[in-house]
Amino acid sequence: MKILVLNGPNLNLLSKRDKKKYGNKDLSKIETLIKKEYPKINFTFYQSNLEGELVNWIQTADKSFDALIINPGGYSHTSIAIHDALELCRIPKIEVHLSHLANREDFRQNLITAKKTDGYISGFAENGYLAAIYLIVKILG
């Protein structure tokens, strides 16, 4: 099984962000945790602060991967381009957010991109990624 894990803007700076909201692991530690918890799955990790690069990865994901996990960061509230790319992507897709968005600012309540995924997980820090992988394994059987 091959899973693409995409991370959007500012997730490369997790070590500088509020640990109460985002957890205490930086992106490389999250990637290591994922590989340790699911050693039989082939993961490709990609992070970009650029919307177009994320769109390019999504557009080709269903050619090379069995599933997609995406944390679009702030783009989840604003990006029609990512929304549209997700709509065209024909593999299971789960959106993950480290922080508990329902407890955050009003502008974070509208998840444009999540509407084109199979579901989203919010508020469990790095464990949200593990939960998404668990669900993908169940979906793909």
Predicted regions located by residue number:
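Short acidic/histidine-rich motifs immediately flanking catalytic phosphotransfer sites
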Residues: A61-L68
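Short Gly/Thr/Asp-enriched flexible loops that form oxyanion-binding sites at enzyme active sites
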Residues: S79-C89
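Short, glycine-/small-residue-rich phosphate/pyrophosphate-handling segment
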Residues: F45, I94, N103-G141
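Short glycine-rich anion-binding loops that position phosphate/pyrophosphate groups of nucleotides
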Residues: P9-L11, G73-S76, S99-L101
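Extreme N-terminal starter segment of soluble prokaryotic enzymes
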Residues: M1-L4
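Short, acidic/small-residue loops that bind anionic groups at enzyme active sites
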Residues: L88-A102
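Short beta->alpha junction loops
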Residues: T44-G52
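Glycine- and acidic-residue-enriched helix-capping/strand-helix junction motifs
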Residues: L13-S28
